[in-house]
Amino acid sequence: MKTKTFLAAFLAALMLSAGGAVAQEECPRGTLDERYCDRDGDLLADTPTDPAELVDPDTLIFAYTPVEDPAVYKEAWSDFLDYMEEVTGKDVVFFPVQSNAAQIEAMRSGRLHIAGFNTGSNPLAVNCAGFNPFTIMASLDGNFGYEMEIITYPGSGIETVEDIRGGVLAFTSPTSNSGFKAPSAILASEFDMVAGRDFEAVFSGKHDNSILGVANKDYPAAAIANSVLSRMISREVIQADDVVSIYKSQTFPTTGFGTAYNLVPELRANIEKAFFTFEWEGTSLQREFEKSNEGQFLEMTYKEFWDVIRKIDAANGVSYACE
């Protein structure tokens, strides 16, 4: 009897194990973290099929990528978030974040539901935190994106990129596309210049820190996003002639907006509706972002729009593993 009982238990365990292996095989995920699946091949974490894994919070938390003073953007987003409250029937709270890493961790841990992640952080947010981006800001004629520029100050003695050799170049943070990853790849491929060998790299933390650092002559040169530079000049934080551009890249997609992967589908649909039906005219959002010629939310797919960014990451040996 004991032998039969043991055998039955063994066979049951074997079947469960086999079932688990099949389930594992039926959950393709590419570079996504092991907690996510990507059965439709869009490179994004799928919505959970188990209702118990879906969330429908009473209060939605929104965070915008950590550039410049968070207080500025709390005000800038206020009219939009009021509209989102109307559309979703939920309270919506602006959550100021101080770093890309903190923003990603907040979404991974379930404390952040809607976000705008900067260009370089999007792939890590997608793969590690289950971020599902679906829109970016664009101009009214449908153009979108920004360029990475390397800037210096007048009279610095730096007139070309090669003049940075033997000197210092300020980056923003390791997760930033225009503030680190793109310039690193471009410097290596176009100029045979590598940080630590040909110049000293320092990190300022944010684009506005780098821009102010150059304008105040604390940094001889910096790699920055020109969309941030344009807004700072428009707000007269610096004057246009405080800095000089010595390099301008191809156009990259700008901040990607989206939701956590596990919100209930009806809520996610209403959040998307809020983005695509928001009337910009006369709002706090328009007042801030018209400075960089943005005036609408444009539908996009991460798989297509972030292809160039993933290629830059691959060239830099970037891993999307959660740390």
Segments from the language model and where they lie:
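Bacterial N-terminal signal peptides that target proteins for export
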Residues: 1-8
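Ligand-binding "clamshell"
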Residues: 125-137, 232-246
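Bilobed "Venus flytrap"/periplasmic-binding protein-like clamshell domains
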Residues: 62-85, 119-120, 124, 143-212, ...
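N-terminal hydrophobic or amphipathic helices and topogenic motifs
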Residues: 21-102, 286-323
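Short helices/loops that flank or line small-molecule/ion binding pockets
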Residues: 101-115, 128, 162-163, 207-227
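Bacterial N-terminal signal peptides
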Residues: 8-17
